[in-house]
Each structure stands twice: as C-alpha cells, then as structure tokens.
C-alpha cells in the first residue's frame, strides 16, 4: 500500500522508458524509496526481508536499499547471504545500480579481502544482472591502487554478451581511466575487449568532464571501425 501511495507522485512512463522490457514498474522516485528504506531499517527490517514481495520492480529495489541501510550482521557471511538473495532478484539495471553495501566505505575497507573475492565471483557468473552487479560494485569500491591491475584483468576477461554487462564494463573502465589515466591507457592499447564495449569506453571518457580536451582528442582517434 505504501508503495502504491508513493507511485501516485512518481512518473511511471519515465521510469518505464529508462527500463525497457521490465514488467510491473510503479514509477516511484528513487529518493522516496531511499527514505522508505531508511524507515524500514529502523524497525523490524528482518521481517521485511523475509516477507517482501518481488512483483514490482520497486519492491526489488527497496529490498536492496534496506540492505544498504541496516547495521551489517556481525557474521559477514550472514550479511553476504542476504546480499546474494538480493542479487538473484535483480531484474533491471536500476535495481542493480541503486544498491550499496551497508556500513559504507568503512565496512568495505574492514572486509576488503572477502568482499573483493565475493564480487569477483559475481563477475564470473552466468546471469546478465549478476555479472553487472559484480562490475558495478567493484567499480564503486575497488578502483584503487591495490586492486587496479587485477580489476583490469577481470573486466578484460568478461565475455558475457548481455547489453547491460557491456555497458557496465565500459562505465567501469572509463572510471578507471579518470582515476588512473596512464595505466588504463596502457590497457586500452592492448586488450581483448569486443569492439562495442571498447568504443563505449572511449565514448564515456570523451563525455567525462574530468578529462582534458587534448586527451579527449587522443581518445577519439583510438576508436575502432
């Protein structure tokens, strides 16, 4: 009922246009869902996770948002099991990309080794949104000095044909370029990416406001036919 009330002040046609082919979209604004998730996290959130439905896209999104608002379980594996249950229900890029780990960067730093291995497993999964989850989350938390080389290798090894996987890899590698331009440039000159993904990376780099004009000119010249 609460979701249906929020849907009344949302924009269903716009949300559907952003998520083509996804059924049962209510069109609720993301900030409204985040507020609701924060409220649920302060109450009986475990009961919510156990009884939550997945009919509407926004119900799936809300499930992930609640996982990002709660205090993570003392046992990391219990929390990751909850996250895994969420990943299995992802049915759109927007459900995937609105997720954040509970506890923020401090939580990630404290459990970096296990979380890194966890995300690598998703990058090797079969499902389109499972792989996207691994790519987007690794981009969000692990584009750093310690993980860059392995991260580039992971992205380069992905062979999934899903559109939303390719777009995620392109996005992630453009972020790598902004943060580590020289080392990512070396990678761009010698990689095994398909042409669509490779050219999308270049496009995203050119569109970035954090890349200078001369570099953008060079990047444009690297496009594959």
Feature names for model-found ranges:
Residues 1-225:
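Alpha-helical scaffold domains
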